[in-house]
Amino acid sequence: MISKRRRLDSEDKENLTEDASKTMPLSKLAKKSHNSHEVEENGSVFVKLLKASGLTLKTGENQNQLGVDQVIFQRKLFQALRKHPAYPKVIEEFVNGLESYTEDSESLRNCLLSCERLQDEEASMGTFYSKSLIKLLLGIDILQPAIIKMLFEKVPQFLFESENRDGINMARLIINQLKWLDRIVDGKDLTAQMMQLISVAPVNLQHDFITSLPEILGDSQHANVGKELGELLVQNTSLTVPILDVFSSLRLDPNFLSKIRQLVMGKLSSVRLEDFPVIVKFLLHSVTDTTSLEVIAELRENLNVQQFILPSRIQASQSKLKSKGLASSSGNQENSDKDCIVLVFDVIKSAIRYEKTISEAWFKAIERIESAAEHKALDVVMLLIIYSTSTQTKKGVEKLLRNKIQSDCIQEQLLDSAFSTHYLVLKDICPSILLLAQTLFHSQDQRIILFGSLLYKYAFKFFDTYCQQEVVGALVTHVCSGTEAEVDTALDVLLELIVLNASAMRLNAAFVKGILDYLENMSPQQIRKIFCILSTLAFSQQPGTSNHIQDDMHLVIRKQLSSTVFKYKLIGIIGAVTMAGIMAEDRSVPSNSSQRSANVSSEQRTQVTSLLQLVHSCTEHSPWASSLYYDEFANLIQERKLAPKTLEWVGQTIFNDFQDAFVVDFCAAPEGDFPFPVKALYGLEEYSTQDGIVINLLPLFYQECAKDASRATSQESSQRSMSSLCLASHFRLLRLCVARQHDGNLDEIDGLLDCPLFLPDLEPGEKLESMSAKDRSLMCSLTFLTFNWFREVVNAFCQQTSPEMKGKVLSRLKDLVELQGILEKYLAVIPDYVPPFASVDLDTLDMMPRSSSAVAAKNRNKGKTGGKKQKADSNKASCSDTLLTEDTSECDMAPSGRSHVDKESTGKEGKTFVSLQNYRAFFRELDIEVFSILHSGLVTKFILDTEMHTEATEVVQLGPAELLFLLEDLSQKLENMLTAPFAKRICCFKNKGRQNIGFSHLHQRSVQDIVHCVVQLLTPMCNHLENIHNFFQCLGAEHLSADDKARATAQEQHTMACCYQKLLQVLHALFAWKGFTHQSKHRLLHSALEVLSNRLKQMEQDQPLEELVSQSFSYLQNFHHSVPSFQCGLYLLRLLMALLEKSAVPNQKKEKLASLAKQLLCRAWPHGEKEKNPTFNDHLHDVLYIYLEHTDNVLKAIEEITGVGVPELVSAPKDAASSTFPTLTRHTFVIFFRVMMAELEKTVKGLQAGTAADSQQVHEEKLLYWNMAVRDFSILLNLMKVFDSYPVLHVCLKYGRRFVEAFLKQCMPLLDFSFRKHREDVLSLLQTLQLNTRLLHHLCGHSKIRQDTRLTKHVPLLKKSLELLVCRVKAMLVLNNCREAFWLGTLKNRDLQGEEIISQDPSSSESNAEDSEDGVTSHVSRNRATEDGEDEASDEQKDQDSDESDDSSS
């Protein structure tokens, strides 16, 4: 066949005839089988030439037969036409014959369909593909134009015809002949005819014809057809999809594509969802490196597929469909929409995976969004998709997400929207999402950890069973990791998942059960959560299912309760009580039979009762364990998790036990030999000898001490006894039982509010010094027990509405304040004292007394730590602080080696002052409800007299001392709950509980609940704040008489000032809470701001947030006139800053904030607040930072301080201060200097260099600003000549280098294109900077002479920056053809005072290098490549050179 082709290429007509004769046998075979269907010649040139070339036409439905190879046929026909005697007229006759032949639709159809090839020919070719007759004829150049013309003439008659019975559309079949032609003779004409056909074709054929264009036209016609399609796109938007699909396959001009892209972008919001995949594909494929960011940003803005999902769901749920058919079509439409969205993101994922430019553009488009309002759910989806594409993108996405989360740009509602809308898209990348969540969990920022937990939550909610299993497994891994923040958050997520989908969680219960092996390292609150999770899974099982989890939990709890190791016993108590609560509230029983339901409920009550009895029997011999059991049981009742009938059984038992153990009649005289006279003290009622009750505290406590001492070496008695150490916790359980049973009414036990206690006179007076150590410890322990009793009494009765009870509660509050003073007196003289425990849990376990053997071993093996307390003297409170370790319980007689007080100070007279904050672990916790007492008014001593004690109907009001007592506790609670956990260092389990000691009850309340309670307290707190404000205003009033001023003692002023500060701290903690950024908390924020706004003027309801913030800011700023201390002023500033964070336009108030900060700096404060006070220095740093951060002109502010305040300080006496800035002294100068240098560097670093295209005015403004910055820098550097201490020099080295680097990056480009027009200004700027760099050079030499490594380690980097500056200045001068302005000179090294530094190495002077006068080692003459930088080793080597020289630019 190859030889035959070569012969055809070289021979003439005779050879053609010979070849035709060779094919005759095949033709004869064909005639024998198909003779009846063969078309007769009838003298037609068309038929004759076809037959001569090897093709036989057939009639009817029979295919035309091709007897030779297609290429041979085309060549034979071509040569037959060219060598025909009538050429070129024969072409016209041939085409006319074809036209006549195809007038019959069947014949035309045959010509458009592929030819039949004979078997022998197929075998020889090895292919089964055969072209149609028309396709073969189009491959002959001399026939192509005429045949194309004929085809386009025939197409219109088939445009509006439907498909044939065999599914063939003739119009499509005709156009298909034009596809993939080897050569197009007249492409321009073909393009014109195609476009003309498209313009008249029906819509369905228009789509097909348009999409066929790339397969029909050659590359030379792409520009023309693109232009015409662009015009058609404008005219007919229904053709957008096929036209854009074609554009992706055409070679078009980028500018043209840019116009089309803009046109499409404008219509993107109005297109149908099914068109999105093609449109997005076009947009992504048409981007270039330069336009990618712009295109992606615009696409992100306009691509909103969410509107196609949510409205359809809402509409489907709200509309009433009239028939099932409509409902079915609606469902199909929703499924179709989801499929289209998946296709859209498949296109995007494909582009991101294979086009790095697109991936980076998406990343940058999301990165540059700065506000939460501008972010969309699409941003979250795209970040997750980018994260899943490759390992190279993961770090970048993690960093960006962290920044967005920390700036509150991406919040929970956005993530929820992303998952609920695009869960089908995200489901495919579930492993990557879980990997990202795991990574975020390892952060130290609680907000980032929370975001990771949300990823787990939504993955579990929206994804399939396999992914749910992976989520639970990952969360269990976090729980067992040992990192407190991870553990807490993972447990919270598991609790949420149980609420979200309990049935799915039950399938994964086996994973969760493995956490039981890690209980030893958990905190009490974590243990509660674990048992809550497992109990919920265990007791929510459907009837008939396996209860293996219940069995495992019962085994674990019984094992821990029976343990002789106290830590495990505590775990068992917590777990048992938690499980009892879940069992009691479980209601998942079938309701088929009321009798069966009653039986099951009775069985549940029996289980709960037996479990509680087990706990009680295991704890009754240990005061520690009993106290924890009572507190845990009380929490269970407080959370309303106990069934009424169970509560009834418990309540009566508790009431009887308490009464028998602690309450005696008033007339019953205490029996025993006590070291002090026993009296009934702190009673609020006058009892006769016949009635009344008393708390039998001293006799019971003293009896316990004696018993402990007598059985120090014996086994613990099995006889049941109630310890006085359980008094407070037992009472808490009692009052919660009574309150629950009587709907909060405590009349049944109201006698405990005012009853006295059997005590000695606790006030030591002058006899304190003469007391023995044993007596001191005994008295101190009784004071602690009394103090904690009153705290629980206030907890119990604080919400009673009776005026009489309210008055008694306030009286108890006064008793608490009095007892605080007594405690401080005792603790000051008993340094090694350890108080009796107040509450027991694992957090405080390490701080409690141990047995003597345990303490001795601990002291031998472990150094003493400030946080851990050892066993104290048996004569102290620890005589009854018995701890069951192993199988013995004894009182340790050996004193601990260290005092509990970590922060103590000794006065000049040798008296030790103690802070009770260090003893927080030994105080009973105040409930959040106690602060409702703040609703009582504040009465100062100006008004307070004894009348209110004599008036029976007058409500006792709150005094300053009692107010301070409450505010201190509230402030600590809010700091612990509302302060962002990322601000607290996340520690390991060894110290995990320290910051939470004393807040165990608080942590069982939600943060939102705490915030809601505080918002309710805003009105009384504002009342107190205004009263204190008026108090200090009156003190400063000139018309106040001397007698009135004398009445306001220093102690009262101090107390009022402390109240002022605590109120501001509480308000700041509230409004700085990050939870307000969540959408669900906005209503709470509005409520809080409305309270403040209404204090200024009565506001209408539902005011916009911005107005509320503005009014609240105005209200609070009015208090700055009366702040009594610098610290109060700082908290006021912080509070105002917290309010500004809630504003959308904070800049309007920033200048006012700066003004307030400046007033604090310019005010003379009491002497004790400034001299060498570290706390004051920290506060001063913060206030100065706030001033410079919020002022509108930082450079001007720095110039004012350095130009006015510092000269006043320099000329003032040694201990004096600046008159303009009284806070600026010689001791605080370093703080001012450091903050000013840092803010100056930050300011210039933020300046934009600009471009040469900027206006001349912009260039002049930037030059002026840089002149001010360099002048400030010069003033600051020159101050180190006067104040040359290490901190000042260190700041100069550190921030001097940073300033030079900022000048290089931000200012030098500006000087490049400003030099020609502003030559003198630029040179003046450089000359000023040269003086500064020379000072820095001298500072480097001075540091080397002082041989202070803290300073010299900064020298190499500073010198490197200075050298780069010299070279950069020279490059700028060369660029502007001003080389003569740069010269090299030699300058000897000098110190800060200008004295020459004598070289220690005479030989080094012969080989020294030339330095710039900026103090930079420069080898410009040696063409040294300074742009590449130098390593520190070379810089340090240069530091050893004795002589250095200078380059200067002028």
Swiss-Prot record:
Record text on subunit structure and interactions: Homodimer; cannot be ubiquitinated and does not bind DNA. Part of a FANCI-FANCD2 heterodimeric complex that binds and scans dsDNA for DNA damage. Interacts directly with FANCE and FANCI. Interacts with USP1 and MEN1. The ubiquitinated form specifically interacts with BRCA1 and BLM. Both the nonubiquitinated and the monoubiquitinated forms interact with BRCA2; this interaction is mediated by phosphorylated FANCG and the complex also includes XCCR3. The ubiquitinated form specifically interacts with MTMR15/FAN1 (via UBZ-type zinc finger), leading to recruit MTMR15/FAN1 to sites of DNA damage.
Gene this protein is translated from: Fancd2
GO biological process: brain morphogenesis; cellular response to oxidative stress; DNA damage response; DNA repair; gamete generation; homologous chromosome pairing at meiosis; neuronal stem cell population maintenance; regulation of CD40 signaling pathway
Residue ranges with Acidic residues bias: 1441-1450
Linked residues for Glycyl lysine isopeptide (Lys-Gly) (interchain with G-Cter in ubiquitin): K559
Maturation and modification: Monoubiquitinated on Lys-559 during S phase and upon genotoxic stress by FANCL in complex with E2 ligases UBE2T or UBE2W. Deubiquitinated by USP1 as cells enter G2/M, or once DNA repair is completed. Monoubiquitination requires the joint intervention of the FANC core complex, including FANCA, FANCB, FANCC, FANCE, FANCF, FANCG, and FANCM, and proteins involved in cell cycle checkpoints and DNA repair, including RPA1, ATR, CHEK1 and BRCA1, and is mediated by FANCL/PHF9. Monoubiquitination prevents DNA release from the FANCI-FANCD2 complex. Phosphorylated on several sites including Ser-220 and Ser-1399 in response to genotoxic stress by ATM and/or ATR.
Disordered: annotated span: 1-37, 853-879, 1398-1450
Function: Required for maintenance of chromosomal stability. Promotes accurate and efficient pairing of homologs during meiosis. Involved in the repair of DNA double-strand breaks, both by homologous recombination and single-strand annealing. The FANCI-FANCD2 complex binds and scans double-stranded DNA (dsDNA) for DNA damage; this complex stalls at DNA junctions between double-stranded DNA and single-stranded DNA. May participate in S phase and G2 phase checkpoint activation upon DNA damage.
Family, per entry: Belongs to the Fanconi anemia protein FANCD2 family.
Keywords, alphabetical: Cell cycle, Developmental protein, DNA damage, DNA repair, Isopeptide bond, Nucleus, Phosphoprotein, Ubl conjugation
Disulphide connectivity of cysteines: none
Subcellular location: Nucleus
One MF annotation (Gene Ontology) recorded for this entry: DNA polymerase binding
Listed PANTHER family: FANCONI ANEMIA GROUP D2 PROTEIN
One Pfam match: FancD2
Feature: compositional bias, Basic residues: 859-869
Descriptive protein name: Fanconi anemia group D2 protein homolog
GO cellular component, as recorded: condensed chromosome; cytosol; DNA repair complex; nuclear body; nucleolus; nucleus
Modified residues annotated as Phosphoserine in this record: S220, S714, S1255, S1404, S1412, S1434
Disruption phenotype: Mice display delayed pre- and postnatal development, defects in germ-cell development, and increase incidence of microphthalmia and tumors of epithelial cell origin.
Biased composition (Basic and acidic residues): 8-21
Domain of life according to the entry: Eukaryota
Region spans: Interaction with BRCA2: 246-357
Species name: Mus musculus (Mouse)
Phosphothreonine sites (modified residues): T1426
Chain positions covered by the region annotation Interaction with FANCE: 1-289
